[in-house]
Amino acid sequence: MKRIFLLIATNLAVLLVASIVMSILGVNTSTMGGLLVFAAIFGFGGAFISLAISKWMAKKTMGCEVITTPRDSTERWLVETVARQAKQAGIKMPEVAIYQSSDMNAFATGPSKDNSLVAVSTGLLYGMSQDEIEGVLAHEVSHVANGDMVTLTLIQGVVNTFVIFAARVVAGIINNFVSSNDEEGEGLGMFAYMAVVFVLDMLFGILASIIVAYFSRIREYKADEGAARLAGKGKMIAALERLRQGPESTAMPAQMSAFGINGKRSMAEMMMSHPPLEKRIAALRAS
């Protein structure tokens, strides 16, 4: 109940702040053009702010410990492997970090190819062979080299804009319909209108998440292909086979899970950020 209240309160606060900002900027959201500007500013703005602080957020939320000076042979091998793969991929050396988790997982994040972070869990580091880990690292380096963080940020910005724009257009249509059938012609009223917008934001948001998940799955196949080139097809397949045999991964924060090696499994594949491991293995074997 508390989470629902916070979600509603946050949404209303965002709407209030957005309205104030648009008023200051002189943008008239009662027109389609003004509404589209409003939607684009907040749709892309939120996505790019998330991208800009992605490394900082990852370190804070996942408790990542960046390896500045390797403390043992395992950390030294980890850093050297990422450095070698980054050079092969033609990108600047990412920061390398370890985070405490029993899950066998890893992720890449960062605002650009030259400002990125590759992090692995302790569960993966001590639960896989070096060949398997090399495949995982190559997958994450490929995400960085392919510019997937920026690509998905642009996609997220587009769908955010759609959600904000469509929700308010539909809410306006509903408001006009109610107003035309109301003797006083008052329509929904401010709070009812905001409630309708909130519900529509949630509904369109579900549709948007399906679209983003679809593109995320495509990028996963591309990262697997890149990993096969950097580390060898056998190592990438071995890593995926090892993940398939292990327990289901618990969910990471959304901004990291899209670029993780192991996504959360779901009955509805269209909601998954990662294709099923069986399909990824089959795609690699067929390539």
From Swiss-Prot:
Main location: membrane
Pfam family, any one: Peptidase_M48
Gene3D superfamilies referenced in this protein's UniProt entry, alphabetically: Metalloproteases ('zincins'), catalytic domain
Gene Ontology process terms (BP): proteolysis
Enzyme class: hydrolase
Record keywords, A-Z: Cell inner membrane, Cell membrane, Hydrolase, Membrane, Metal-binding, Metalloprotease, Protease, Transmembrane, Transmembrane helix, Zinc
Transmembrane portions of the chain: 4-24, 33-53, 154-174, 195-215
EC nos: 3.4.24.-
Protein name (database record): Protease HtpX
Upper classification of the organism: Bacteria, Pseudomonadati, Pseudomonadota, Gammaproteobacteria, Alteromonadales
Gene that encodes the chain: htpX
